[in-house]
Swiss-Prot record:
This is Small ribosomal subunit protein uS2. Belongs to the universal ribosomal protein uS2 family. Keywords: Ribonucleoprotein, Ribosomal protein. HAMAP family: Ribosomal_uS2_B. Residues 257-306 are annotated as: Disordered. Disulfide bonds: none annotated. It holds the Pfam family Ribosomal_S2. It comes from Streptomyces griseus subsp. griseus (strain JCM 4626 / CBS 651.72 / NBRC 13350 / KCC S-0626 / ISP 5235).
Length: 306
């Protein structure tokens, strides 16, 4: 079954590129035609590239990796936060801080600082042992850290790969990922440079519906990878598959527990029906013996009368 259909891509406007005067010649091979001064992206190529990116993300997560979702433009902020939160992955949908990947040790210290500030009760001035002014300063510091680092609060190390919406706007993130040899999965509009991206998806990175659809596809790949990872951890996987390296998201645990309950109920039902059949089979010979014994005296009485 296809990850996404051609109809969904068309309805979301994934095929619309930029104006013909705003393009990168390296994207020529992904362009189908031009209409009214707008480039039209070849969706047949997009479909094959989506499948390739989907498999990469799924395998990366299944082997214990993590995917960072990055998109700070207004059209992408909501979709990035929603889909990354759904699958329990880190995300950046506000300003990208320089060094977020290449200088992660310093960023990690700021994350620890954020967690310290979250322990303070800003409503109870007396119990905090601080003045109102000091609490106000700390409250502002906490709000600033939450805005810039809230999406990566639980991140313990640099991600295994990054999903990026608009590589031109997020050129700093792309540069840091390439410097650390972290694979980049991204939407490529007609004004982007395909050489910067490892797993490219030719498409529209400006329309909200297009960005939402493609980000959801990547999140679905993450979800499938998490399920495969949990199967490896419980020993249900095929030989050669890697075990889980990171905890599952809460929604994944609920899903798996529900599946296990269904399997247990089905097994119990099969066992009960098998036991019922055995009892029935055991009762049949006993009934036959009883009938034979009842018929024997009747036959003897008939013989005596004769």
């Amino acid at each position: 079954m296809a990850v996404v259909t051609m109809r969904e891509l068309l309805e979301s406007g994934v095929h619309f590129g930029h104006q013909t005067r705003r393009w990168n010649p390296k994207m020529k091979r992904f362009i189908f035609t031009e209409r009214n001064g707008i480039y039209i992206i070849d969706l047949l190529q997009s479909l094959s590239y989506i499948d390739r990116a989907y498999e990469f993300v799924k395998e990366t997560v299944a082997h214990g990796g993590s995917i960072m979702f990055v998109g700070t433009k207004k059209q992408a902020q909501e979709a990035i936060a929603e889909q990354a939160t759904r699958v329990g992955m880190p995300y950046v949908n506000q300003r990208w801080l320089g060094g977020m990947l290449t200088n992660f040790s310093t960023v990690y210290k700021r994350l620890q600082r954020l967690k310290e500030l979250e322990l303070i009760d800003f409503e109870d001035v007396a119990a905090s042992g601080l003045t109102k002014k000091e609490l106000l300063v700390l409250s502002r510091e906490k709000a600033k850290l939450e805005k810039t680092l809230g999406g990566i609060r639980e991140m313990q190390k640099v991600p295994s790969a990054v999903w990026i919406v608009d590589t031109k706007k997020e050129h700093i993130a792309v540069g840091e990922a390439r410097k650390l040899h972290i694979p980049v999965v991204a939407i490529l509009d007609t004004n982007c440079d395909p050489d910067e991206v490892d797993y490219k998806i030719p498409g529209n990175d400006d329309a909200i519906r297009s960005v939402t659809l493609l980000t959801r596809v990547i999140a679905d790949a993450v979800a499938e990878g998490l399920i495969a990872r949990s199967g490896a951890a419980t020993g249900d996987s095929k030989p050669g598959e890697k075990a889980a390296g990171e905890p599952l998201a809460e929604w994944e645990r609920d899903l798996l527990e529900g599946d296990k309950k269904d399997e247990t109920a089905a097994a119990a039902e099969v066992q009960t029906s098998a036991e019922t059949e055995k009892v029935a089979d055991a009762e049949k010979p006993a009934e036959a013996v009883a009938e034979a014994e009842a018929e024997a005296p009747a036959a003897d009485a008939d013989a005596e009368q004769a």
